[in-house]
A protein has these predicted regions:
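Short functional hotspots at interaction and active-site rims
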Residues: 1-180
Length: 180
């Protein structure tokens, strides 16, 4: 954060999450003796999403759908973040294998060092990443106890939640507060 403050940069935490077409049964109300039920197709058609949350009083949320998680799609996400920020980004990530860039990605990162720097969290420390809270909130608002007939329907619900995060930053403020 000191480095970011010295150059008026923006600290963001990044992560990726998958959302299945199948709904997930989560804590809910039901009549006594009746098991809650969520319809399902039995298919795991997955939406892969990269996301990043800024460490500010009014956190910003950026996201990008990807066909798969790998170094190539991660590079596309980095370019997406840089394109949408006027300030230098300090992106903090976990050690997921998809965050490993190939040679062309490393070269791009070197050429854009004045716009973005990457930092790694210690292994097995998701509690240090507020983006995990954004994913938890997304699943709570979007996929728990819901049945989607199509991937388009699920993706539209996800975009609706992400848009709510962007237009109402207070939804993520609780996940970011301890990092400010």
């Amino acid at each position: 954060q000191k480095k970011a403050l010295s150059c008026r940069g923006l600290v963001m935490f990044g992560d990726e999450a998958s959302f299945w077409l199948d709904g997930s049964l989560h804590r809910t109300w039901a009549r006594v003796g009746v098991q809650p039920h969520v319809d399902t197709f039995g298919m795991r058609k997955t939406a892969h999403v990269f996301g990043a949350v800024s460490v500010e009083e009014r956190p910003r949320f950026r996201y990008l759908f990807a066909p798969v998680f790998n170094g190539d799609t991660f590079l596309i996400f980095l370019k997406h973040l840089v394109k949408r920020s006027r300030r230098k980004l300090f992106l903090i990530l976990d050690n997921g294998p998809c965050h490993n860039l190939k040679d062309d990605g490393k070269a791009w990162l070197g050429r854009n060092r004045h716009r973005i720097e990457l930092f790694r969290l210690p292994p097995y420390s998701p509690n240090y990443n507020p983006t995990e809270g954004a994913w938890k909130e997304t699943k709570k608002r979007t996929t728990h106890n819901r049945f989607f007939r199509t991937t388009d329907e699920r993706d539209a619900a996800l975009v609706g939640t992400f848009t709510a995060f962007q237009s109402n930053p207070v939804l993520l403020a609780g996940h970011v507060a301890r990092f400010i």
